[in-house]
């Protein structure tokens, strides 16, 4: 099995786990995310659009930003240079 198949399977396994989270814990506790789309939807979109490692970096940065120290609002997946764009968003949205 080559590395691309492994990452493909890993992507869809994580998507499956996120969907379980969305249908259980998210419904129990309500939406707490300060962004649109929510962090779980953002993560699914990242996993579908980018390779596993890029998606992992984007999901991690987004999850770290989802708290009271950052400005919420619309935050869509970057179309170009996803990691550098996400890092710029990280700095831009930090409440100083």
Swiss-Prot record:
Q: Which UniProt keywords apply?
A: Cell inner membrane, Cell membrane, Membrane
Entry membrane topology:
Peripheral membrane protein
Where does this protein chiefly localize?
membrane
Q: Which InterPro entries match?
A: Membr_insert_effic_factor_YidD
Q: Which SMART domains match?
A: Haemolytic
Query: Which GO cellular component terms are attached?
Result: plasma membrane
Q: Which domain of life is it from?
A: Bacteria
Subcellular location per UniProt equals: Cell inner membrane
Query: Which Pfam families would you find in this protein's record?
Result: YidD (PF01809)
Q: Which family does it belong to?
A: Belongs to the UPF0161 family.
| Biological role stated in the UniProt entry | Could be involved in insertion of integral membrane proteins into the membrane.
Record protein name field: Putative membrane protein insertion efficiency factor
- Organism of provenance: Borreliella afzelii (strain PKo) (Borrelia afzelii)
Taxonomic lineage from the root = Bacteria, Pseudomonadati, Spirochaetota, Spirochaetia, Spirochaetales
């Amino acid at each position: 099995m080559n590395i691309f198949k492994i990452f493909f399977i890993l992507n869809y396994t994580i998507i499956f786990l996120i969907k379980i989270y969305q249908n259980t814990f998210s419904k129990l506790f309500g939406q707490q995310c300060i962004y649109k789309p929510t962090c779980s939807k953002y993560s699914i979109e990242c996993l579908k659009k980018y390779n596993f490692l890029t998606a992992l970096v984007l999901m991690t940065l987004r999850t770290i930003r989802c708290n009271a120290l950052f400005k919420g609002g619309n935050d869509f997946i970057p179309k170009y240079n996803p990691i550098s764009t996400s890092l710029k968003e990280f700095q831009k949205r930090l409440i100083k």
